[in-house]
Amino acid sequence: DLLASRNGRVVLISSNSAPMCDRPDYVDLLLAGDEPAAAALADTITGQQTYSGSKQAIARWMRRNTADLAAQGISINAIAPGYTETPMTAAVANDPIYGDAIKKFLSSIPVGRPGRPEDMADLVEFLLGEKSSFICGSVLFVDGGHDAMLRPDAF
């Protein structure tokens, strides 16, 4: 339907963890669509590696397909949320094992607070609207400045 109307917008969800992936072989398998090999490799690496790798694959797929989609009238972007307060993250923050580490992590967010669902929703709403018509093929970090702090020379 988007292609038929030649006037669509797509927003993918990546993560600010995507640049931290240290398993390019896993990302390459995901991008190649080799699900059995990717699943087999995922069984041998850490959960963080599979998470960041899958999010990196989303961002790379988007960038590789941006020109073709834009030529067909489809704008595509991705958001890369950082730590966001949700019922799931609240449970981890209150966990006796992980709680202290989460509190330390949260104190390192440059803007001084974790993300809220509405922070993500506001950006998605903007990207889906007319005021973002020239933004295409971008990964926008919504992480309170964490990515800029951790990777100041990478963009």
Walk through the language-model features, giving the residues of each.
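Short, flexible catalytic-loop segment of classical short-chain dehydrogenase/reductase
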Residues: 81-91
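Conserved catalytic-core motifs of eukaryotic protein kinase domains, centered on the activation segment
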Residues: 22-24, 89-94, 151-153
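A short C-terminal helix-loop "cap" of Rossmann-like NAD(P)-dependent dehydrogenase/epimerase domains
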Residues: 32-42, 94-109
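Catalytic loop of short-chain dehydrogenase/reductase
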Residues: 4-72, 83
